[in-house]
């Protein structure tokens, strides 16, 4: 059974961090359709292709060998919840962009997930200072309900 989020008044000291119409949560809501995908790290890979000079594929060990990036950010879901000071670990998206060498004609990025979800972003937003591919949340590996083994994090 789903627990109902108790919505309390927002402390005025942090109210500026909550967009209009959002509510603050301490939980990390699970929002996906259908069964939770199961990833086998022995066969998992990250494919980067399309309008780039250097398409490539990384298996899990190659991804984990990339330089690490950690950040603490507020996240605001389109379903109207906000969670402050979330801690993420993974790889800065600029590591991936530098390897792929996008062509000048690449204006958008289309991201695919194992379960069929897609999201597109303008290249200018994808190449932002806080965008990352995260494999950790709050110092632990991502859980399957939250995107294990890898999740695109776009805080803004």
Residue ranges and their predicted role:
Residues 1-156:
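Structured, non-membrane catalytic/scaffold regions adjacent to prosthetic-group chemistry
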């Amino acid at each position: 059974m789903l627990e109902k989020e108790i919505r309390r008044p927002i402390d005025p000291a942090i109210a500026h961090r909550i967009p209009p119409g959002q509510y603050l949560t301490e939980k990390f809501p699970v929002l996906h359709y259908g069964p939770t995908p199961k990833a086998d790290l022995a066969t998992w890979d990250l494919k980067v292709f399309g309008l780039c000079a250097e398409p490539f594929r990384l298996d899990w060990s190659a991804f984990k060998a990339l330089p690490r990036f950690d950040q603490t950010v507020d996240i605001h879901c389109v379903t109207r919840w906000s969670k402050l000071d979330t801690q993420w670990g993974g790889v800065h998206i600029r590591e991936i962009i530098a390897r792929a060498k996008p062509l000048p004609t690449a204006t958008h990025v289309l991201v695919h997930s194992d379960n069929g979800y897609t999201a597109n972003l303008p290249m200018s937003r994808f190449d932002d200072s806080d965008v990352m591919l995260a494999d950790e949340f709050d110092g632990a590996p991502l859980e399957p309900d939250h995107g294990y083994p890898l999740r695109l994090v776009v805080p803004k």
